[in-house]
Amino acid sequence: MVLSLKEELSQRKKELLSPIKSVYFGGGTPSLLNKEELESLLEEVYLCYNVEPDAEVTLEANPENITINKAKAWKGLGINRLSVGLQSFKNDDLKWMNRGHNNKQNSACISDLYKAGFDNISVDLIYGLPGLKASEWEGFLKKVVSMGVEHVSAYCLTIEDKTKLKHEIENDKIKPLSESKQIEQFDFLRSFLKQNGYEHYEVSNFALNKNYSKHNRSYWERKEYIGIGPSAHSYRGKERRWNISNNHTYMSRGTKTQNWYNQEELSLSSIWNELFLTGFRTMWGVSKNEIKKLGGFTNQERKEVKALIDRGDLFDSGRAYVLSESGLLFADSLSESFFRVL
C-alpha cells in the first residue's frame, strides 16, 4: 500500500503547485505504520510538493497505538501535531463503541506525547451518547482541560442507518439521548471550554492560544487540497474528485485500464451552497467578497439575511456574515436556507 500511495503522490504532483500548509495522515489508523513507512511517505511528499517550512504535519492516532518511543520517532520525522481519538473517559462507552483503549490509556497517551516533545495536541470527544449524564460529560471536559491539550474536537453521536446502534434503538435495547439533552451538553461544552481559555472557532472545534487546525480550516475556507489513497477526496476550486474505496483495485490501478477515481465539475450553485455550508460553521463566517464574486444576493436572500439578523441568529462583522451563538446550534439548517437549486 505504501508504494501505491507514493506512486499517486508522484503522479499528481502537478495538480497542486502552490505552497503546502498542511500534511495530514488520517482516514483510518495511520499510527499503525512503522517509522520507515511514515518516513518514506513524508520524503515523497517533500520531494513532490512545495511544503512550507512551518507546515502543520498531523498524524491521527488512537490511544492504544501510542507509546513514548513511537511518539519520539514521530517527532523525529517532523510530525508536529497529533490528533488523538479519546472519544470518552467511560470504559463502558468505549467498549460499546468498539474502541481498543480504556480510560487509563487516554491519560497515559497524552502524557507520553508531551514527554516526547509535542506541543500541539488535539483530542476528539463524543457527546450525546445514550445514558451520558451531565455530570459525566462535565467530568470528561475537566479531564481534557487538566491535560492542557491545545485543541478539542467534539462531535454529537450520529445514529447511522444499517448499524448495530440503529438496530438496538429500533428494538428498544438502547434509549438514545433526547435532543434537548444533546443541546444541553453542547451548550455546556462551549461555555466550559470558553471559561478555560479555548476559542470556539468552528461548530465542533475549540482552540487554545489560536492553535486552529490548518488542515480542517482549509476545508472550511474551500482551499484546494489533494487526498491520497483509497476513498480519499480532493478539491480543486471547481472540481471534486474521490478515489475508489477498494484497496485491491486501488493498488492494482497501474495495470488496469478501469478508472480508479470519480470526479465532478461543480456548478455555480454547488459552489454557492458550499460557501454557506462551510462558512456558517466558523467564527469567520461567509465572506462578503466571496458572495460578491459569485454574483451577490438575490432580493429574497437579502430579506433572509435581515430576518436572521433581526432574530439574533446572524450578525454582520463588516467583512462577513457570521452566525451568533444561538445560530450555531442550527448552522446546517440556516445554511440550507441560502441554498440554490442545483
Descriptions of predicted regions:
Residues 320-324:
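Minor-groove-contacting beta-hairpin "wing" of winged helix-turn-helix DNA-binding domains
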